Amino acid sequence: FALLLLAGEETGSFGAKAFRGQHPGAEWVIVGEPTDNCMASASKGTKSFEVEFTGKAFHSGYPEHGTSAVNLFNDFMNALRSIVFPSDDILGNTTWNIGRLSSDNPQNILSPELTCRVYFRTTFESDEMVCNVMKNMAGPQARLRFGRPRVQDGSDIVAKEVAPWQKAM
């Protein structure tokens, strides 16, 4: 049995990684993280992909001679927005966002390079699908940075409503 109070959960889960290194294979762990003051026995998984788009730099006055990595990114985003990920009765909808976007070049030059991070919160139904979609859409440019599979302990309790006095806090 162990108690883990998470540190750095939004920036790399450094506390959880340190814990795992010192306590590999702990049979039972209570994880304390700031999630609405409720108990949960299931949580969404996480998948973070870094995707690089490579264009061809050229002066913006002659765009026909280059390829904008920003336009390639826009095509990718339009395709990703069109995907309907399955909903899950327990964990709800799959959600995603672009957490980091980088393209550093002069404003009058077609961007030769753009990198983004796509962060997914996956469900029982969508965990594997997300990986397949990203592999197919971004091809070899997509690199899985880290991921945590969706978790459920087998109980019927997913989340317990907080007490009224806790809501006031």
Where are these regions (language model features)?
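Acidic/histidine-rich catalytic neighborhood of metal-dependent amide-processing enzymes
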Residues: 1-48
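Metal-dependent amide/peptide-bond hydrolase catalytic core
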Residues: 9, 34, 41, 47-169
